[in-house]
């Protein structure tokens, strides 16, 4: 059964690549050639997230059975082909639906002296209406500036290609979801500009249907491709410094994977809106209730596009309550883990 599935998967990938090469939506060959100056000599490690867990993992699957690791691999292969055509050396951490340990993925990037690390993922949540891009960098925005810059480019290109240039996105530290140490593949490759990209949510029925379509996979790959070109064409690449900031922030414990599929996780936005409304009304009792609701929203969906505002409103409440130490900690959390778009005066990259 598994061997048969792998054979079908290989055949599909061959068809997928063939389809996209002749697709009118694929970037023109002249475009790849014109980008050779930006990518010539660059080593780019592409990490298709997960893999080989269909028999053991019931979390990473859409409403009609499409699995995240299959989507990740399709997009990664397409992106790799685009980058090769433009002159880059491309390293994929996996090329089939197989399990690769997280430490090995980081090791592959380091051993090949990668100039950029791109981990391709897709997201899941209990709310089927949710669908927007999330991009993670490792550690602190003030220390890992190169990855924040690249992450901003990726997020905006994903909005451009998959959401017609409209709608929200999140650019956050991996400490927002793994509050003690961040994500393994980004932690293990720290020093290389790198991100984890969660382009869309396969738990959205409409999105899952799109993610099965080769041309749509190609659009996503094109978004990453354009972001990579923009990054290497930047006149000045920001620095990555030694990690100190994350250890200076008390961990904010949040819902993990399966917990984010629970019914209470669906209340993330309504809890945010209720908390915001109570804060405006004022009064000590309302402030306490607002703080609890905002905290619950941030815990249940820590990387949502309202999570930063949840923390900013929590900060406002803490200031009103005169809790000096808690205020200082919340200020650090916001500054380190939820950077403002274009905070270092980079131009808007959607268009």
Q: Where in the sequence are the language-model features?
A:
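Catalytic-site microenvironment of enzymes
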Residues: 2-351
């Amino acid at each position: 059964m598994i061997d048969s599935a792998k054979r079908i998967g290989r055949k599909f990938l061959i068809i997928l690549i063939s389809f996209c090469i002749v697709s009118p939506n694929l970037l023109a060959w002249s475009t790849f050639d014109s980008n050779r100056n930006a990518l010539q000599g660059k080593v780019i490690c592409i990490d298709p997230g997960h893999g080989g867990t269909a028999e053991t993992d019931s979390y990473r699957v859409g409403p009609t059975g499409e699995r995240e690791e299959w989507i990740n691999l399709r997009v990664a292969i397409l992106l790799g082909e685009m980058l090769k055509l433009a002159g880059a050396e491309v390293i994929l951490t996996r090329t089939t639906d197989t399990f690769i340990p997280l430490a090995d993925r980081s090791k592959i990037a380091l051993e090949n002296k990668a100039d950029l690390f791109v981990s391709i993922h897709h997201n899941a949540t209990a709310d089927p209406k949710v669908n927007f891009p999330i991009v993670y960098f490792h550690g602190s925005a003030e220390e890992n500036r190169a990855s924040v810059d690249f992450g901003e480019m990726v997020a905006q290109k994903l909005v451009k290609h998959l959401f017609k240039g409209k709608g929200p996105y999140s650019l956050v530290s991996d400490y927002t979801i793994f509050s003690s140490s961040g994500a393994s593949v980004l932690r293990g490759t720290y020093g290389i500009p790198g991100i984890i990209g969660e382009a869309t949510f396969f738990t959205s029925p409409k999105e899952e249907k799109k993610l099965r379509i080769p041309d749509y996979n190609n659009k996503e790959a094109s978004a990453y491709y354009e972001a990579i070109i923009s990054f290497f064409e930047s006149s000045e690449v920001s620095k990555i410094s030694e990690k100190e900031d994350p250890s200076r922030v008390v961990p904010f414990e949040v819902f993990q994977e399966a917990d984010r599929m629970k019914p209470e996780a669906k209340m993330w936005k309504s809890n945010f809106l209720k908390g915001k409304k109570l804060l405006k009304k004022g009064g000590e009792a309302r402030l306490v209730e607002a703080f609890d609701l905002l905290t619950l929203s941030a815990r249940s969906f820590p990387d949502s596009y309202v999570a930063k505002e949840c923390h900013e409103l929590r900060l406002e409440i803490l200031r009103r309550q005169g809790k000096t130490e808690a205020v200082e900690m919340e200020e650090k959390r916001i500054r380190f883990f939820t950077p403002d778009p274009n905070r270092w005066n980079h131009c808007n990259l959607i268009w």
